[in-house]
Structures are given as structure tokens and as C-alpha cells.
Amino acid sequence: MMLKTLIAAALSLSFAMPVLAHPEHVEQAPSGDSATQKKPRRVSPGKGKEPHAPLIAYKEDECLGWKLLVNEDLIADKELHKQVLDEVHHQLFRITRILPEEKVKQLQTVPIWLELKNPYSSSCQYHPSASWLKANGYLTEKAKCVDIGSAERFLHETKTRQPFVLLHELAHAYHDQHLGFNHAGIMKAYNAIKEAGNYEEVLFSNGRKVRHYALTDQKEYFAESTEAFFGMNDFYPFVRAELKTHDPAMYEIVKEVWGLNR
């Protein structure tokens, strides 16, 4: 009887539903750095694995005032390259229309790197830390940049659940470079929602109730709130009106820090 119980318990663990993961994030930084990540999913190249592409493998391009650095492997796949550039243009164009001109100019200083398929990256992330990049075998030139690590995954996610993913990543850059990750107002609001518990179980875009990705840390909280305020997020609150009713304090902070109270 005891053996049957143990086997049943093991089977229940084996077939447990995986924890929902968000594909885009700020990468984990070494101790003492300001960036964090919910679940480290990337490692530096190990024995027998290809290293990250060298700087010479990237060609410079431009899109609506943003510098693009495109991996030559992606350029070689002409159709995929075109699709990715079209989607990047589409998202950046929306950003130029919905944000104040001053903020757009600040975001245009953030380069965007495009990969065909980097096995050590998820689809899209912002890199705040040169030391983390160096320690994990990445190009340190990617520091303070947005990195699209997988072209196909980027296209898939933007079509199915995250139409404003570049806004999310550029919000990380703005938070890091212009507000500071320890911005007092954002930290206060983040601590308040953790205590209130009203982000612990929210509607996800697939109809499931899940823990909101914003609870990861104050960085994701700000980026997720920015997505909801200016576009559409994949976690409730999905849009601006819902953010205003669900989290009025953060609604006002987003308005203020993006310059909409002037």
C-alpha cells in the first residue's frame, strides 16, 4: 500500500502543469548589480557549444530613428528577415505615435539587436549590465540595449499574446537609464500590490487565472503597467481603463513618469 502511494505521488509530480513563464525579461545580473530575473534560463556557452556571434557578424541598419544591429544569419534568411523588420517597424511606429516626442527621442538612443536564433537567449530582453554579459559570454556591446534573441519566437509571441513587446523592453531601458530601478514611487506602488495581493490571481490572455508577471520585481511591474497603459498587455489589467480601476496608484505613476501630466 505504501509503495502504491509513493508511485502515485511521483506520477502526480511528473505530470504537474508547468509554471507559466513570460518570454521577455531583464536578464539576471551578478550580485550587486541592479537587474534581476524571475528564472535564469540562459547560460554561457559550455564545452562543445558554439559561442555567441562576434561583433563582426552584425550589420547596422536603422528604423524610425532606432539603430538596429542585425545578425548576418538572419539577413541570409530573406523572408524571415523581412517579416521581422516589418514587425519591428510596426511596433516602433506605434511607439512614436503614443509616447510624447521627448520620450521617443530618449528611447531612440537604445539600440536593438536582432538574432536569427540565439540558443542562450529568449525571444526579447533588455540588458542593463555589461558585467553580466561578459560573465555569460555575450557581447558587452549589448549592454543598455534591447536584444531580440529569436526571430521566429519574436514573431510568434507578437502575433499571439504580446503585440507591444518592444514597448515593454524599451520601458525597461527607460526605467534603468532615466528613472533608476529603485525609483521611490514605483518601489512604493510595487510593495503595496505585493501586500494587497490583488495581482496574485489575474486573468491571462488564454483565459486562465495566473499569478501576474508584474510580481516578479519592480522592473517587470513597471514594464507590464506601461504595456497596459499605452497598448495591450497579456495579463489583466490588459488596457489603460483596467489599470486605472485595478491599480490607480500605478496608473498615476505611469502617467507622470512618461510625461503625460504636463
Task: Name each model feature, range by range.
Residues 1-7:
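Bacterial N-terminal signal peptides that target proteins for export
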Residues 5, 20-115, 119, 128, ...:
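N-terminal low-structure segments adjacent to metalloprotease catalytic domains
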Residues 8-18:
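Bacterial N-terminal signal peptides
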Residues 57, 160-164, 212:
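Alpha-helical hydrophobic/aromatic positions enriched in membrane-embedded helices and signal peptides
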Residues 71, 81-195, 238, 251:
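Acidic/His-rich structured neighborhood in mature extracellular/periplasmic domains
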Residues 134-143, 149-152, 156, 190-262:
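Metalloprotease/metallohydrolase-associated module, dominated by Zn2+-dependent proteases
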